[in-house]
């Protein structure tokens, strides 16, 4: 609360004025830090995005391909071209990406490729840092709206968050995020949900240890091949004939 300084003597006025200026400085500093945080968040993956843009200038990606976008589960999928040899795939995964980052960079990562289908894998990092299932869904809706403004009929698939044993303590929130997203997708045209959860569990409902690398968070090749098996029926007709 700011005191009324008009009825005070000179020393009191000086103290009152100092208190006011100090409070004002704190407010300005807090706002400045908030602005800096916003800028840092926006630029956190700038180098990653610029690297993709430079690679695309040097070797333009195929148009009308299936585009993968999202976090490290796609970024680390280095064998995707071998695992899906009958499809043209463009991979735009970035390590540690969240759904909000995908919204922020959609016009640079996604739209220039003019894909025929988009498959997302995001949400796990969101949950890991404490975002709610509702926030993940809200950001997913924002991504869909941003893309559909330019590509109105494009199919967009949300690859459900996986039950990695290294983050099994987050399983209830991950499952809830999958549930609310899947329920929303069921009400919308040209949105698909890739449900990986149950296939990655043992018969007694625990995460399968054979599908992960040493960190128990990211899939190994067997984990990616399982993903291919589940995804393939959603991909449509192959665009390449295998010899």
Features from the language model and the residues they span:
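Charged helix-capping and loop-helix junction motifs
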Residues: 133-143, 173-178
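Catalytic His-Asp segment of secreted/periplasmic serine-dependent ester chemistry enzymes
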Residues: 163-243
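A short helix->loop->beta-strand "cap" motif at the edges of active sites that frequently abuts
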Residues: 151-155
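N-terminal secretory targeting modules
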Residues: 1-67, 74, 78, 82-83, ...
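Conserved beta-strand elements of the Class I
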Residues: 67-69, 90
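Oxyanion-hole/transition-state-stabilizing segment in secreted/luminal serine hydrolases
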Residues: 74-90, 99-137, 157, 161-165
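N-terminal cationic-hydrophobic initiation segments that often serve targeting/anchoring roles
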Residues: 81, 110, 148, 185-186, ...
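Extracellular glycan-modifying ectodomains
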Residues: 59-61, 108, 125, 138-150, ...
């Amino acid at each position: 609360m700011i005191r009324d300084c008009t009825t005070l003597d000179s020393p009191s006025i000086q103290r009152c004025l100092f208190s006011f200026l100090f409070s004002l400085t704190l407010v300005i500093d807090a706002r400045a830090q908030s602005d800096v945080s916003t800028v840092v968040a926006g630029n956190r993956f700038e180098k990653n995005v610029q690297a993709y843009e430079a690679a695309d200038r040097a070797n333009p990606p195929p148009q009308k391909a299936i585009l993968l976008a999202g976090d490290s589960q796609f970024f680390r999928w280095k064998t995707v071209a071998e695992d899906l040899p009958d499809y043209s795939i463009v991979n735009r995964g970035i390590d540690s990406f969240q759904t909000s980052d995908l919204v922020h960079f959609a016009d640079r990562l996604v739209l220039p490729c003019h894909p025929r289908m988009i498959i997302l894998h995001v949400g796990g990092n969101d949950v890991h840092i404490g975002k709610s299932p509702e926030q993940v869904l809200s950001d997913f809706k924002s991504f869909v709206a941003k893309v559909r403004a330019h590509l109105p009929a494009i199919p967009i698939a949300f690859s459900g968050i996986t039950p990695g044993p290294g983050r099994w303590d987050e399983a209830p929130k991950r499952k809830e995020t999958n549930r609310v997203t899947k329920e929303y997708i069921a009400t919308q045209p040209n949105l698909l949900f890739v449900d990986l959860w149950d296939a990655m569990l043992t018969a007694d409902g625990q995460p399968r240890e054979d599908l992960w690398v040493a960190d128990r968070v990211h899939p190994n090749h067997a984990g990616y091949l399982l993903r291919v098996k589940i995804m393939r029926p959603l991909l449509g007709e192959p665009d390449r004939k295998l010899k």
